[in-house]
């Protein structure tokens, strides 16, 4: 597929360094091994080889979502690909679902959710801070070229949105998600799933304790994902010296109806 003006593009040099661009015919990409006018990239097929002004070769690709989220500008913490994938799987995000997300943050989680729910689903992304909301919206528009119809961005307190949205899934990246857990206990439909991304142990403890106290969340799971690349060169097969360790804890829980002992 050919790349067009406005598309995101990824250039990879001979040492594997990656450069994320938004193609604009009036711009030139410059780096330590020369320059490449964007016009030399526009209209080229992804997978093409490009030569810089000094003769250096670069590989031109359309970026994966993982590339985009790792290279995107950040105004808040980013949910990295190693955590984004498990969130989509363990929270069972599927086409056609309505997902309530908070906060919007960098926009990385919003992008993953949007792709997972597809054109028949809906992501309602809620952010307290207007600057973070604007940054997230810009990231989503940069990836899609516009704000897609299946994403709605709101400014406000997500606890106030649970009842009106009635989400099948709630996904949280907030400093104090336990407040939303309390709201979800009252208003999320039974059978729904709630997921939260938390960097610290105290946040983890408070969120799990709050969920248990409500009496309507079950199958509470806490997971941490670590990623290590491996190097394969002939008979030499070994792990890389560096690995991606702790970035955050992931909590997953399922909403139930109120137990008979609590009714009335």
Regions inferred by a protein language model and the residue ranges of each:
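N-terminal auxiliary segments of SAM/dcSAM-dependent transferases
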Residues: 1-62
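Glycine-rich helix-loop-beta junction characteristic of Rossmann-like nucleotide cofactor-binding loops
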Residues: 89-94, 116, 144, 162-164, ...
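Conserved SAM-binding loop of SAM-dependent methyltransferases across substrates and taxa
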Residues: 106-119, 185-186
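Conserved S-adenosyl-L-methionine
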Residues: 115-122, 190, 217
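S-adenosyl-L-methionine
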Residues: 126-177
């Amino acid at each position: 597929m050919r790349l067009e003006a406005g598309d995101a593009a990824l250039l990879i040099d001979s040492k594997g360094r990656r450069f994320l661009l938004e193609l604009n015919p009036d711009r030139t990409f410059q780096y330590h091994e020369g320059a490449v006018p964007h016009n030399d990239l526009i209209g080229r097929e992804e997978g093409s080889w490009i030569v810089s002004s000094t003769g250096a070769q670069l590989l031109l690709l359309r970026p994966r979502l993982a590339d985009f989220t790792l290279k995107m500008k950040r105004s808040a913490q980013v949910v990295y690909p190693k955590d984004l994938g498990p969130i989509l799987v363990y929270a069972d995000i599927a086409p056609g679902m309505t997902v309530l997300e908070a906060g919007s943050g960098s926009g990385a989680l919003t992008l993953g959710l949007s792709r997972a729910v597809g054109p028949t689903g809906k992501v309602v992304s809620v952010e307290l801070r207007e600057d973070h909301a604007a940054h997230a919206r810009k990231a989503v528009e940069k990836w899609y070229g516009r704000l897609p119809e299946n994403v709605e961005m709101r400014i406000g307190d997500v606890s106030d949105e649970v009842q009106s949205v009635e989400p099948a899934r709630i996904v949280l990246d907030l400093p104090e998600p336990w407040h939303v857990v309390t709201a979800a206990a009252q208003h999320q439909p039974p059978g729904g799933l709630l997921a939260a991304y938390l960097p610290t142990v105290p946040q983890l403890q408070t969120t799990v304790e709050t969920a248990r106290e409500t009496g309507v969340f079950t199958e509470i799971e806490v997971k941490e994902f670590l990623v290590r690349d491996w190097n394969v060169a002939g008979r030499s097969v070994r792990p890389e010296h560096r690995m991606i360790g702790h970035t955050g804890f992931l909590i997953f829980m399922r909403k139930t109806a109120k137990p008979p002992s609590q009714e009335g």
